[in-house]
Amino acid sequence: MINCPVDNQMNNSDVSQRPHHEVVIVGLGPTGATLANILARYEMDVLVLEREESVYPLPRAVHFDDEAMRVFQSIGLAEGIGRDARVNVGTKFVDRDQKLLLDWPRPQEIGPLGWYPSYRFHQPDLEAELNRGIAACKTVTLHRGASVTAVADLGDVVEVGYSHDGAKQVVTADYVIGTDGAKSVVRAAMDCEWEDLGFQERWLVIDVQLDKPRPDLGDFTIQTCDRDRPTTYVRCPREWRRWEISLWPEEEADDVTTDEFIWPRLRPAITPDEGRIARKAVYSFESKLATRWREGRLMIAGDAAHLMPPFLGQGMCTGIRDVANLAWKLAAVLRWKAPDSLLNSYESERREHTRTYIETAVRVGEMMNSAETAEALTHAIRPDGAAQMNSISRDLDHAIGPQGDEMSGMRMPQPRLDTGELLGDAMAGRFAVIGPDEVLESVTLPPENIAVAISAEAHSEVAEALSDLGIIAMILRPDFYCFGSVRPQNSSGLSDVLAEFKKQVHS
């Protein structure tokens, strides 16, 4: 039995008589809300337990990327989320004299994933859209103001105890997913430790709502690299702006959150008569990975599984990738009769992938603390003496799929079908078996509730994508990574890929 402290409410009663759900999600931040929306597409019976009574009304996370947007697309919420967001133009790293050290421009065109590569957003807007999606899901039950007091894995089922509306409740679930942040009760129930990757700094985060537009402040994020006091300026949607200021070890939170400390550091950019400070908080930026992401029927995702400095804007994005990976595997086990061992691949695929993002964010943070301009110039030198940074695009390590297939775990582009819809819309949470008609007609395809067949001959951008990849057919996962591929010299190979697919994903 795996326990966090168990109340008496968990004892002396028949487990079979308790309300049962297929999945219980603990925590309703963006990661948990996205997971609930995805699972609803598979008509899963989901209970979400969130301790807060309402959505936090002020900004926290401020960035997501095209991969996250593709997941939002898969749950039918991309239009609303995109309407409230702002396409991000990029980041400039400068020294204390504002000399450009490193440029990180973000493309202003739709990218290969079908969306702009980078967005700035207002988190209350995002959470409102995600919660709107949950409200429309008939199979998802949400309890706000619910404090989880106990989690116990009994082997064939998980017991969850919680307080809600003044009463103690106990339910059971096939699986419990902790998306409940750095102090996760689910991670505690797993008795799971942190692996510390060595970065810890205290920063003051200030969110300002301007009284009127200030185009002179610029649209680029500005990272000021200064050994004494690194700072960050972020252009957020509408009239929201963020400043982040590194703190010295001896500076106390009560002292640095005063107007006397803050406003002199925001001048000359803005003054008190040009906007109001909506939020001021001291954060500890850390770099940590949970040593295990699964223990029996308990799993963790998002900040419950990893913490990273914000310098890449990938913290929330990583949580979205977590649940996109995990959700379809839960569907495979609970709906498609896949072996429970498939869920082990959640940790093996996601943990080291996440490590890359954390380590890169740490390097950026170290660069911001550098006194030497040369240390920032780690990429190709441009004629003006500044370097240009490229975005991370990482495939999965140890991905499931046919043994020896180098494309298994590779992140795939999203072509537009000749019908006008994006490929992900046609997939609707399923796998896609993609290839020419002759190849598709030569095999027995999975049931339509598991996979959709996409003809390369009927859709020109699909055919072009396969050609660019040097393959003639593939199976694309619901999280848009490749399961397996077929090379031109092996036109009969799709049957082998499908055999492996049936072995690993459904029976």
Predicted regions and their residues:
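Active-site-adjacent segment of FAD-dependent monooxygenases/related oxidoreductases
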Residues: 60, 65-133
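Glycine-rich FAD pyrophosphate-binding loop
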Residues: 40-60
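N-terminal Rossmann-fold NAD(P) dinucleotide-binding loop
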Residues: 32-33
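Conserved FAD-binding catalytic core of PHBH/FMO-like flavoproteins
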Residues: 132, 150, 175, 179-285
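Core beta-strand elements of the Rossmann-like FAD/NAD(P) dinucleotide-binding domain
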Residues: 19-21, 166-175
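Helical substrate-recognition/capping region of FAD-dependent monooxygenase/halogenase enzymes
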Residues: 2-22, 26, 41-42, 73, ...
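A conserved short coil-to-beta-strand element within the FAD-binding core of flavoproteins
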Residues: 144-158
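FAD/FMN-dependent oxidoreductases across multiple families
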Residues: 253-318, 353, 357-360, 489
